Curated annotation (Swiss-Prot):
GTP binds at residues 17-24, 81-85, 135-138. SUPFAM superfamilies: EF-G C-terminal domain-like, P-loop containing nucleoside triphosphate hydrolases, Ribosomal protein S5 domain 2-like, Translation proteins. The lineage of its organism: Bacteria, Pseudomonadati, Pseudomonadota, Alphaproteobacteria, Hyphomicrobiales. PANTHER family: RIBOSOME-RELEASING FACTOR 2, MITOCHONDRIAL, TRANSLATION ELONGATION FACTOR G-RELATED. The gene is fusA. This is Elongation factor G. SMART domains: EFG_C (SM00838), EFG_IV (SM00889). HAMAP family: EF_G_EF_2_B.
Length: 690
């Protein structure tokens, strides 16, 4: 079947925002007005189409980014719904990676919130073109102009209003379209499906002129001809203006800001028009780069004629279809039944069922093209971030980077049957979410779950109990400490064992020193003249690696260390890779002691938003948790406190904060860096773990 929509008519975009800014409601309305949903799902009734996992419907927050295809103005929209809670930023990173553009939704009562900043920074990292939608204009305290100021102050970006609200709060009637210079008002009886263009209300004419002038001036700066014409007194026509605004979005010169209330069904259709008019198609963004099987850089253009390349960006377990792998096709054509190679893992796969997803309804397809986002059923080897490609033209697309988990809990199944179910379930959950790790404690034999925060692990445990029916005891959350050396140390170690017959002999000299923070572990062999034969070097590395997972302070993983193998001795008969492994392990442990290893603890960036009355109590409490206050400012009538606090002191903080502020203060927390733990904390941890 030939392609039904030209690739320039595709819009692959995501909707990103702070939790509770109304992102899922906005997506729901988009699905309703594009004719995909017959009944509007309300988040607060737990019925939103995109939020299809049970846990999401109960908590009213979006956890997994569901991908949906819809159509508007002859264009094909592939929408990725992303979570706004900080514990799920991995989902956001992953979806931004495969999008061409994004709509950033703000709560116009709150302006730019902490998680908005996080997702905005992630958007900057992947250079995602964005437009902004100031939502909830019907709410008490809604302030469109504060949103504009916040974008400058908190995001350091240049916002340009292309709409203005008509009224606000209870009187929010509609909006002024500054491109057309017309008002738009909605018909409430039709659930906002019908709207009319009207003259701009008299009391807004001056304001509309002022903001239109700002918009036109910003736009014409991007084009010499338009600027020359403008300076001669000729305003750009509507088509030129749209072309220039589009150029601004694609280059990041400025960000168009729209407004509305998705909940009250106002402003959604113009938002869809803006997606079509201003967000890029797959051919408007730079072609994706990768490396071929020889390690050379190659480019894959968004074109059906190019060799096939697709990226797996999400894996889900579906009760009816089994494992579903969401993929973005960057180039070429994918047909069901064809063989592909997973170049990341060097495994062959056959494409079975191909599905187009609509939240959790699905449509079988036989063929998909460059620019499509498809769900593939039954892939055996694929993991998040893997590349699937043409076996004859192999490529590995850019890898995604996933953050290290900072919190862990032990889980013990209650019975043998639960043990078996747990194993299967954890393998599936770890495949779906790379920021969720599973390991076994070597000494206790316990299964350890690691994640990005308490909520992240709560939800995983919930899924284990509900979806996989695993009955288990859950331990208290533990902090993921690390260890590192603080000074250079040189150690020579000889391993000798003689017990009749062949003995064991190996001698190594190593130099261990701190590496730059974040640089991780680096090994270098400085051996010259065969003091340690080449075939034994892997044995040395194996020994060093075995110590990296369990340091000398309290048995936590060692980070940011450089190890050089500078000298050694071997014996023709008694030396072996195993002997060198044992020698290097002992040498490394001794060097870590000599190099004054210290305990590192995760430090979290905490932002508390509280009414003025509770500021003193909140700051006092943060100080008592070894927090360092970084600054305060006002947001509306609330006080915003920024602090760096050790994670080990933040457990159960949510309940404390609630009781301290009578439920009126909120906080967000995300991992910032590792820092050396004070001596008393280190001693306490050593007593507990060593």
């Amino acid at each position: 079947m030939p392609r039904q929509h030209a690739i320039e008519d595709y819009r692959n975009f995501g909707i990103m925002a702070h939790i509770d800014a109304g992102k899922t409601t906005t997506t729901e309305r988009i699905l309703y007005y594009t004719g995909k949903s017959h009944k509007i799902g309300e988040v607060h009734e737990g019925a939103a189409t995109m939020d299809w996992m049970e846990q999401e419907q109960e908590r009213g927050i979006t956890i997994t980014s569901a991908a949906t295809t819809a159509f508007w103005a002859g264009k094909r929209l592939n929408i990725i719904d992303t979570p706004g809670h900080v514990d799920f930023t991995i989902e956001v990173e992953r979806s931004l990676r495969v999008l061409d553009g994004a709509v950033c939704v703000l709560d116009s009562n709150q302006g730019v919130e902490p998680q908005t900043e996080t997702v905005w920074r992630q958007g900057d990292k992947y250079k995602v073109p964005r437009i902004v939608f100031a939502n909830k204009m019907d709410k008490t305290g809604a302030d469109f102009f504060k949103c504009l100021a916040d974008i400058v102050d908190r995001l350091g970006a240049k916002p340009i209003a292309i709409q203005l609200p008509i009224g606000a709060e209870n009187n929010f009637k509609g909006l002024v379209d500054l491109v057309k210079m017309k008002g738009i008002v909605w018909n409430d009886e039709s659930l906002g499906a019908k709207f009319d263009y009207v003259d701009i209300p008299e009391d807004l004419v001056e304001q509309a002129k002022e903001y239109r002038e700002k918009m036109v001036e910003a736009a014409v700066e991007l084009d010499d001809d338009a600027l020359a014409a403008f300076l001669d007194g000729n305003e750009p026509d509507e088509a030129t203006l749209k072309r220039l605004i589009r150029k601004a979005v694609l280059t990041g010169a400025f960000y168009p800001v729209l407004c509305g209330s998705a909940f009250k069904n106002k402003g959604v259709q113009p938002l869809l028009d803006a997606v079509v008019d201003y967000l890029p198609s797959p051919i408007d963004v730079p072609a994706i780069k990768g490396t071929d099987d020889r390690g050379n850089e190659v480019v894959r253009k968004a074109d059906d004629k190019e060799p096939l390349a697709l990226l797996a960006f999400k894996i889900m377990d579906d009760p009816f279809v089994g494992t579903i792998t969401f993929c973005r096709i960057y180039s070429g054509v994918l047909q069901s039944g064809t063989g592909v190679v997973n170049s990341t893992r060097e495994k062959k796969e056959r494409i079975g069922r191909m599905l187009l997803m609509h939240a959790n309804n699905r449509e079988d397809i036989k063929e998909a093209y460059a620019g499509d986002i498809v769900a593939l059923a039954g892939l055996k080897e694929a993991r998040t971030g893997d590349t699937l490609c043409d076996p004859d033209k192999q490529v590995i697309l850019e890898k995604m980077e996933f953050p290290e988990p900072v919190i862990e809990i032990a889980i013990e199944p209650k019975s043998k049957a639960d043990q078996e179910k747990l194993g299967v379930a954890l393998a599936k959950l770890a495949a779906e979410d790379p920021s969720f790790r599973v390991s076994t404690d070597q000494e206790s034999g316990q299964t350890i779950l690691k994640g990005m925060g308490e909520l992240h692990l709560d939800i995983k445990v919930d899924i284990l109990k509900r979806t996989y029916k695993v009955d288990a005891n859950i331990g208290a959350p533990q902090v993921a400490f690390r260890e590192r050396v603080t000074k250079k140390a040189e150690v020579k170690y000889t391993h000798k064992k003689q017990t009749g017959g062949t003995g064991q002999f190996a001698e190594v000299s190593i130099v261990v020193e701190p590496n730059e923070p974040g640089k991780g572990y680096e090994f270098e062999s400085k051996i010259v003249g065969g003091a340690v034969p080449k075939e034994y070097i892997p044995g040395v590395e194996k020994g060093l690696n075995s110590v990296m997972s369990s340091g000398v302070v309290a048995g936590f993983p060692v980070v940011d260390v450089k190890v050089q193998l500078v000298d050694g001795k071997y014996h023709d008969v008694d030396s072996s890779a195993l002997a060198f492994e044992i020698a290097s392990r002992a040498a490394f442990r001794e060097a870590l002691q000599k190099g004054k290893s210290v305990l590192l603890e995760p430090i979290m960036k905490v932002e508390v938003v509280t009414p003025e009355d509770y500021t003193g109590s909140v700051i006092g409490d943060l100080n008592s948790r070894r927090g360092q206050i970084q600054g305060q400012d006002m947001r509306g009538n609330a006080n915003v406190i920024n602090a760096m606090v050790p994670l080990m002191n933040m457990f159960g903080y949510v309940n404390n904060l609630r009781s301290m502020s009578q439920g009126r203060a909120t906080f967000t927390m995300q991992f910032d860096h590792y820092a050396e733990a004070p001596a008393n904390v280190s001693a306490e941890v050593q007593k507990k773990f060593a």
